[in-house]
Amino acid sequence: MTNTRKSHPLIKIVNHSFIDLPTPSNISAWWNFGSLLGVCLGLQILTGLFLAMHYTADTTTAFSSVTHICRDVNYGWLIRYMHANGASMFFIFLYFHIGRGIYYGSYTFMDTWNIGVLLLFATMATAFMGYVLPWGQMSFWGATVITNLLSAIPYIGPTLVEWIWGGFSVDKATLIRFFAFHFILPFIITAMVMIHLLFLHETGSNNPSGMNSDSDKIPFHPYYTIKDILGILFMMITLMSLVMFTPDLLGDPDNYTPANPLNTPPHIKPEWYFLFAYAILRSIPNKLGGVLALVFSILILMLFPILHSSKQRSMSFRPLSQCLMWMLVANLLILTWIGGQPVEHPFTTIGQLASTTYFFTILILMPSTALMENKLLKW
C-alpha cells in the first residue's frame, strides 16, 4: 500500500512542494527569504482580517476606528502594530529576496522571475492602499500626490485620475475602493505566489555556485524545513521587538493627525520602503518623465535576463561584478535617504546623481563588466 502522503491527490501536491522536493545541498541562508515572505503574507492576511472586523471605511470614522482598535479592542494595539510593522518586514525580505536573485543569477529562470516582478508590483500597490486607510494626514496627502501622478498620462490622464478617485478629489469614494482593493489584493498575491512556486518547481532551485545541481540533491524535509523554522524564529523575534518596544519607529508622526484637506504637511513622503522610488520620481523636473522613471526603476528588473552577458550564472566567482552589485546596494540606500529629505540643495543634486547612477549601473556597467570578465577568463 502506498503512503497517503504520496498518493492522496491534495496531500501529494504539498508533498512534492515542501517534503520530498529535491533541493540543492548547498543553498545558503539567502534562500530562506522565500519561506519568510510566505510567513509574512500569511501573517498580514491574518492580522488584516482581524483589523477589518473593527475598521470602518468612511472618511468621518476611519481615523476613530483605528484609535478604537488600539484602545478598546482586546490586543487591538498588538494586531495593528503587527500589521504595520509586518509590512516593513515584508519589504525588507522582498528586497533581500530580489537582491539574492540578482547576485546569484536566479533571474535566468525567466518565468519565475517575471511573475516575481509582477508580485512586487502587486505588493507595492497593496501597501500603498493600506497606508491610506488610517486616514491620517500622510495617508490623505500621500494618496493625493501618488494618484495625481497618473494625470501625467497623455490624453486620458485627468479623466483616469477622477475615475480612480470616484470624484473630483480624494474623498469617501476613494477610501472605500482602496479598502476593497486592499482587502482583495493579498488573496490575488497568494494565487500569484502559487504560480511563482509552480514555475520554480519546473526547474528546481538555483544554488550559490550557479551550476546545475541535479547530481547533488537532498529532500527538502527535514533539512530545509528546520532551517526555515530557524529563519522564522529570527523574524518573529525582530518583528515582536519592533512591535513591543518601538512600534512607531518606521511610521510617520503626521499620520497621528486626522486627514485635513485644507492643511498640507511640510514634507509629504511615503513609507520608508518606497523612498528609493520616490527619490527617482522627484529627481526629474518633468511630471511625465518622473512617472516614467518611477515605473521603469522597478520594471528594469525584467531586463536582467536580457542584459545578462556573463558566461557564468552566479556572481560568486566574479569579483568585479560583486563590486558593482554592492555599489548598486549603496546607491539604493542613498536614494532611500534622499527620498526622506526635503526638496532643497544639496539633496536634489545628490538624488539626481544617484538616480542616474542607478540606471547607468544596471543598463551599462553591469553587462559590460560581465563581458570584460569573460575576456579576462579567455571565454
From Swiss-Prot:
Q: Which parts form a coiled-coil structure per UniProt? A: none
Q: How is the cofactor bound?
A: Binds 2 heme b groups non-covalently.
Q: Which InterPro entries match?
A: Cyt_b/b6_C, Cyt_b/b6_C_sf, Cyt_b/b6_N, Cytb/b6-like_sf, Cytochrome_b, Cytochrome_b_C_euk/bac, Cytochrome_b_N_euk/bac, Di-haem_cyt_TM
Q: Where does it reside? A: Mitochondrion inner membrane
Q: CDD domains attached here?
A: cytochrome_b_C (cd00290), Cytochrome_b_N (cd00284)
For this protein, the record's Gene3D superfamilies field holds: Cytochrome Bc1 Complex, Chain C
GO MF annotations for this entry? metal ion binding; ubiquinol-cytochrome-c reductase activity
Ligand binding (a ubiquinone): H201
Spell out the GO cellular component terms annotated for this protein, sorted alphabetically and separated by semicolons. Answer: mitochondrial inner membrane; respiratory chain complex III
**Keyword terms, alphabetized:** Electron transport, Heme, Iron, Membrane, Metal-binding, Mitochondrion, Mitochondrion inner membrane, Respiratory chain, Transmembrane, Transmembrane helix, Transport, Ubiquinone
Taking the first listed entry, what is the main subcellular location of this protein, grouped into a coarse class? mitochondrion
User: What is any one GO biological process for this UniProt entry?
Assistant: mitochondrial electron transport, ubiquinol to cytochrome c
Per UniProt, heme b b566 binds at H97, H196
Membrane topology per the entry is: Multi-pass membrane protein
Q: Give the residue spans that cross the bilayer.
A: 33-53, 77-98, 113-133, 178-198, 226-246, 288-308, 320-340, 347-367
Q: Which cysteines are joined by disulfide bonds?
A: none
Q: Where does heme b b562 bind?
A: H83, H182
Cofactor(s) needed, names only, are: heme b
**One protein family per Pfam:** Cytochrome_B
Question: What does the further note read?
Answer: Heme 1 (or BL or b562) is low-potential and absorbs at about 562 nm, and heme 2 (or BH or b566) is high-potential and absorbs at about 566 nm.
Known role: Component of the ubiquinol-cytochrome c reductase complex (complex III or cytochrome b-c1 complex) that is part of the mitochondrial respiratory chain. The b-c1 complex mediates electron transfer from ubiquinol to cytochrome c. Contributes to the generation of a proton gradient across the mitochondrial membrane that is then used for ATP synthesis.
Q: Which family does it belong to?
A: Belongs to the cytochrome b family.
- Binding partners and assembly: The cytochrome bc1 complex contains 11 subunits: 3 respiratory subunits (MT-CYB, CYC1 and UQCRFS1), 2 core proteins (UQCRC1 and UQCRC2) and 6 low-molecular weight proteins (UQCRH/QCR6, UQCRB/QCR7, UQCRQ/QCR8, UQCR10/QCR9, UQCR11/QCR10 and a cleavage product of UQCRFS1). This cytochrome bc1 complex then forms a dimer.
Please state what the protein is called.
Cytochrome b
